[in-house]
């Protein structure tokens, strides 16, 4: 599959690299066509790794990962182009670092509202980027969540997550449930501080 990964930071690099290892063709998108981080990444991937602007990547990808900083995600997706996202699944893994817990909408909801013809699926935003792409880094079973309005889109992402190694996924419901996972961030940050590592996750025992 041709997949766009928007964002050149640690998360974008981890997701894009995993997808290439799994055999997908991946274009890493950034604000400029000559982004140094994106260019350096392509040197590690062989022919399946490409780089371009946000818009280039959105045109290229049959599926789009939003791995940008949550505070700039809407601007990045706008640069990608609403027409280029139409009908496509947009996997939103971003968090706003300082979420407004009184806000009426999550970032996932804001993206869905701004791009109503895209199929937004919120997932992977409750773990660090190493665990996102390698859940076996932690022993035992642990859980990842899905939120989105389109059932077929969530089923497809569920299957993609299985190829990442995820065996326990919970579909929370429509995109409004992204508020729950985004609101987990303050607890996640407190746990990171207390444990001295971000390599942890939660297991929903049932």
Cite the ranges covered by each PLM segment.
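General beta-strand structural signal in soluble alpha/beta enzymes
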Residues: 51, 119-125, 169-172
């Amino acid at each position: 599959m041709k997949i766009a990964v928007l964002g050149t930071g640690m998360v974008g690099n981890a997701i894009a690299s995993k997808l290439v290892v799994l055999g997908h063709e991946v274009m890493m998108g950034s604000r400029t066509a000559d982004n140094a981080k994106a260019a350096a990444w392509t040197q590690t991937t062989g022919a399946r790794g490409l780089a371009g602007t946000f818009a280039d990547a959105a045109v290229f990808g049959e599926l789009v990962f939003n791995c940008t900083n949550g505070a700039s995600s809407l601007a990045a997706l706008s640069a990608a182009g609403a027409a280029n996202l139409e009908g496509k699944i947009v996997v939103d893994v971003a968090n706003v670092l300082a979420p407004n817990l009184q806000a009426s909408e999550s970032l996932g909801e804001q993206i869905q509202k701004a791009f109503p013809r895209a199929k937004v699926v919120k997932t992977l935003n409750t773990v660090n980027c190493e665990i996102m792409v390698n859940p076996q880094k932690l022993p035992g079973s642990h859980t990842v969540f899905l939120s989105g309005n389109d059932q077929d889109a969530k089923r497809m992402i569920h299957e993609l997550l299985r190829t990442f190694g995820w065996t326990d996924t919970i579909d929370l419901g429509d995109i409004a449930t992204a508020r729950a996972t985004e609101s987990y961030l303050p607890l996640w940050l407190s746990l990171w501080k207390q444990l001295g590592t971000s390599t942890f996750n939660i297991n929903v025992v049932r």
